[in-house]
């Protein structure tokens, strides 16, 4: 039980580090263009990250990312030391990349930490390889998808604004930056808030598996003793 508490505390620490690691992404444009002050922008982003939880629960109706994170390792191989090792690795890597200013994905770091710890403990049979390969594919696909979508939107915006006077465009774009920042923060909250839920869910599964008696133990305890 003590180890479970340690993991939950580290999971919350991971979420905190992930917050200051990624917070700048959603507020960079509204701060650099002086739409909001840095303090106002942080409050803006924090509010919409918080709102994202309720969107996931009451509108989307599920926490798919949390389930994916918790199912990275095959259930029978999930142990608290594996989860602890994965979380510590993710925290360490997030701090290193933040310190060096290197963009990185906390989701992929966390899942990689779980997978590495499980492979070290029990071999490749301990991981859900199909899930991990699907996740790894988006490390390479995401930048290209973002580039193509941004390219298309830029063409659309330039076409719409081709006859708009610059001062009018500036007024509208400042307002739209608030909308885009809010949407970015909601997306960040939908994605990243669930990772900690996945860590805690996996830890609780491991704790239950460790403390629950196996069917063999139960059947053995019920066998009458021979005289």
How would you name each of these model-derived features?
Residues 210-217:
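Conserved small/polar residues in nucleotide/adenosyl-binding loops
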Residues 126-144, 212:
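Structural signal for the N-terminal portions of transmembrane helices
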Residues 106-112:
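Cytoplasmic-side transmembrane-helix entry/capping segments in multi-pass membrane proteins
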Residues 55-58, 62-104:
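Anion-binding (especially nucleotide phosphate/pyrophosphate-binding) glycine-rich loop
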Residues 35-46:
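Membrane-interface alpha-helices at helix entry/exit sites of multi-pass transporters
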Residues 1-15, 84-90, 175-180:
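Membrane-embedded alpha-helical segments that form the functional core of polytopic membrane enzymes
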Residues 158-172:
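Membrane interface segments of multi-pass transport proteins and intramembrane proteases
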Residues 12, 16-23, 49-58, 63, ...:
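Transmembrane alpha-helical segments of multi-pass membrane transport proteins and ion-pumping complexes
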């Amino acid at each position: 039980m003590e180890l479970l508490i340690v993991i939950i505390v580290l999971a919350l620490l991971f979420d905190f580090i992930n917050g200051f690691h990624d917070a700048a992404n959603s507020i960079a444009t509204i701060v650099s263009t002086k739409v909001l002050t840095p303090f106002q922008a942080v409050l803006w982003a924090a509010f919409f990250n918080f709102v994202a939880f309720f969107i996931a629960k009451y509108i989307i109706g599920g926490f798919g990312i949390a389930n994916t994170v918790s199912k990275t390792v095959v259930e029978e191989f999930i142990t608290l030391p594996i989860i602890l090792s994965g979380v510590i690795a993710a925290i360490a890597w997030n701090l290193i990349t933040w310190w060096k200013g290197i963009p990185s994905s906390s989701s992929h770091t966390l899942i990689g930490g779980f997978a590495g710890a499980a492979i070290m403990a029990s071999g490749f049979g301990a991981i859900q390889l199909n899930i991990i390969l699907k996740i790894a594919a988006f490390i390479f696909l995401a930048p290209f998808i973002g580039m193509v979508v941004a390219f298309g939107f830029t063409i659309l915006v330039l076409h719409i604004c081709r006859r708009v006077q610059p001062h009018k465009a500036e007024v509208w774009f400042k307002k739209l930056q608030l909308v885009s920042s809010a949407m970015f923060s909601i997306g960040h909250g939908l994605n990243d808030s669930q990772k900690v839920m996945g860590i805690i869910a996996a830890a609780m599964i491991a704790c239950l598996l460790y403390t629950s008696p196996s069917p063999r133990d139960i059947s053995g305890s019920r066998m009458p003793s021979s005289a």
